Amino acid sequence: MGEHPVAEIAEALRSGIEVKDITWIRGTVYKETNPDFEKENSWDEELELLPSFADICRSKELYAQSFLIQYRNTDSVSAKRLAEYYGKNIYVVQNPPAEPLTRIELDDVYELPYQRACHPSYEEEGGVPALREVKFSLTSVRGCFGGCSFCALTFHQGRRIQSRSKDSLLREARLLIEDSEFKGYIHDVGGPTANFRRPSCEKQLRHGVCTHRECLYPTVCPNIEADHSEYIDILRAFIRSGIRFDYMLADQSGGFLRELCEHHISGTLKVAPEHISDNVLKRMHKPDRSVFERFCRKYEAENKRIGKKQYMIPYFISSHPGATLEDACELSVFLKKNGFVPDQVQDFYPTPGTLSTCMFYTGIDPSAKERVYVPSDPEEKRLQRAMLHFNKPENADLVRKALRLLGRTDLIGYGPEALVRPE
């Protein structure tokens, strides 16, 4: 994030240094026009040259290679300077990321006297509707070591967790309560993943995040220090936010799931397994199917123990790179068997800075160095999405078409396993 760089740039400008000479600040990118830049920096082990702009335009393999280098240089401890030759003796140079804020600094940033309102220029149009969803929410953490392929948070906030103090959250909550539009409860307390409140392990603090593996994928790292004790303490003051179920399962105490089910779910828990097919989950960098099924069993058992009828609403993504129509069918069968009715299904669309988008464009998974099937045909994307909402009458024709293409007419009928009725 930009707090440290902005302050350092301001100090440099105040000292009379020209903008073109401010090239040392972490978390910034600058233009280098020295034609001998490569030669003069050939000795620098902390500089890594990316494939040139011309190279990544002509070669998807080099594009994927460039993405992977950038993806592995997002931590302030281990990241190198990166340089890409743009042409005409111009290099784009990216300095290593800024150091994460300390807890005191994070508290200070979020306790500044913000207006908590949209700009007055929007008032004639009725304001900004999206603001209502977040106005009475608290940001508790920054950073995420979840590593989902379709998320750009690794680039924006890094994999190291920074969290605010409970006292700071309470002070901000008191300000929210005083707002004339406050309706009685705080909607959300969290961040990218609410139950990440601390770095994933002690090693991360000393040596930075690992560049050779991720914290939760393909399985939870044995060095993970899953601890929900501080988060549980905060929950006793606030309403539950979104959680990461594989990290919850790594907490051997089991206390967090008990606390969650007993006090912090208002009937339904929203979770995001994203898919069920291991073929797709591999590309998403999400835990495999068995992990979600284990969580479902534990969640059901805990609610039975405390005598509550509480349900689960899963979120899914259709047409993600790697997803075939067969995978969509597998997910539909799972949903039918387990009685899930998806509340939200998002058709994958590419967004800047994500591993999934790199796969979408190149057809290559750079982390696995493998070719990937990309469902880009509009008709197939319609079929995949319809399969996930097979229960909707308006999707019946599309579901039947998909099942016939797959040779799964056994799922068309009136039986308990059928996804759709005949015409």
Q: Which sequence ranges carry the predicted segments?
A:
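Flexible glycine/acidic-rich beta-alpha junction loops that bind and position SAM and/or redox cofactors
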Residues: 3-14, 29-37, 160, 184-210, ...
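Conserved, mostly hydrophobic/aromatic
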Residues: 109, 144, 148, 169, ...
